[in-house]
Amino acid sequence: MSDGATAVARPRPGVRAWPLYVGGFLGPYASTMVTPMVHEVAVGLRTTPEVAAAAVTTYMFPFAAVMLVSGTLAERWGRARTMQLSLIAFVVACACCVLAPTIEWFLAARALQGVTNAFTTPLLVAAITDLVPRAGLGRALGFFAGMQAAGQAASPLVSGPSAVLDWRLAFAFPALVAVVLAVLPPTMTAGPRPTGPPPVRALLNRNLALACALSFLCYFAAVGLTVLAILRAEEDFGLGPWQRGVLAAGFGVAGLLAAPLLGRRLDALGPWRTGVLMNLLLAVGLVVAALGPSVLLLGLGVAAVGVAVTGLRTTVNAIAATSTDGNRAGAASLALSFQFFGGALAPLVWVPLHAAAGGLGFAATALAPLVGVGLAAREWLSRSGPR
């Protein structure tokens, strides 16, 4: 990237921007951090792995539900104040997970983690959109999506080894990140905010509706992959915990490495064309991961999905946050809410289908991005005009 291009992607001078990107790490990390240590949590809290696995859903459903309104509420209460209080509450939630004496208390603490993160992630997207000049917004949101991918990559790499000693140690890392961000908060606005309540009716627009649909479909497929790929790695190829952790980390690592290029492509191609390409890549990656006859092809499929999801996160965030100027945080939180509703629903749909139909049930996850291709292609062609 040239110096000029790099400068365009940076926020305006005089702002503290790095916490915006570090904050993007927390949501994806926290959502999946229990997955690699489900068995250890089950043993520690005297329950079954199936019950302990509900820790993912009990995080995602409150996270998604609260994000329906969290961005708009934060615009009303003040972004900076909301961000700082939410980070402190997240630290408290991590402590509750560590101290939980039973699975019921643990799941309640996971739900609290989800609620607190619902007041951080959309505010970060809104702040980046405000602070970065429009010409470099794709690159900035691409970097943010890369940090989200880093959170997904780090989750199994931290949780897995922590669980070898004591699964409760895994919660120290995200709590420490939240403490740093609370002490050194990011700049949240580019200047004085409009007075009065943020416009809720402005959220009823076509671009935001499409962003919500693409966001839902993306995570509905991708979270299905994160669960089914681990099941397939163990059942079909006999991979152990460390090997499965490395496989799962490949999803986030691939997205992190591809993020700068994806941001530049978004700036060059626009969101709708990028949405078509990323959904096609997502569909191909899902089929390869589901039906590939070797561990290598399974890993390549997981990596391709990781790249596609990072590209779609960037695309959806750009569409949503620019759809409603007077309520950016509300728009961003609404799109993110649909994303995590898709993620929360995914295991409930795809795991039984995989159990019933095997590889074909896994490959069925590709139907979701194919619908996304249709939505994005229709919008792209309608905006391209006659040739």
Sequence positions of predicted segments:
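Conserved MFS/SLC helix-loop-helix module at the cytosolic interface between two early adjacent transmembrane helices
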Residues: 64-101, 266
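Cytoplasmic helix-loop-helix junction between adjacent transmembrane helices
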Residues: 103, 109-148
